[in-house]
Design a protein with these regions (language model features):
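Positively charged, low-complexity alpha-helical assembly interface
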Residues: 2-96
Length: 96
C-alpha cells in the first residue's frame, strides 16, 4: 500500500471483489482502519463494513439489527458459507 491518500481512496472505494471471501475483505478492512487511524463509532464501522460486502450478503442481513463489528463479520461469513454450499449442491445436482 502506498501513501495515506492512496490508502484513504482504497478505504472509500472498498468493496468485496468477485473472488474475495469475507475473511480476506475483513482483514483488509481492519488493516486500512488501523493504518488510517479511523476512529468511527462501532455503529458507523458496522455500516461501512456491511456496505463493502457482496449484494447477496447485504440482502440477507438487511433486516438484522447488528451493532457489533464482530457479530456482523460472523453473520457475513455464515451467509457466504451457506451460499457457497447451495452453489456447490446445485452444481453437483446438475452433474447427475
Amino acid at each position: 500500500m502506498g501513501s495515506y491518500e492512496d490508502k484513504y481512496i482504497q478505504w472509500t472505494m472498498l468493496r468485496q471483489q468477485r473472488d474475495q471471501d469475507v475473511h480476506e475483505l475483513t482483514n483488509l478492512f481492519h488493516t486500512l482502519c488501523i493504518k488510517l487511524g479511523i476512529k468511527y463509532s462501532e455503529k458507523h464501522l458496522v455500516l461501512k463494513y456491511r456496505s463493502c460486502l457482496h449484494r447477496y450478503i447485504q440482502e440477507e442481513m438487511e433486516f438484522l439489527d447488528i451493532s457489533s463489528l464482530g457479530t456482523t463479520y460472523r453473520y457475513a461469513a455464515k451467509i457466504e458459507q451457506k451460499f457457497k454450499q447451495k452453489k456447490q449442491d446445485f452444481g453437483s445436482a446438475n452433474q447427475k
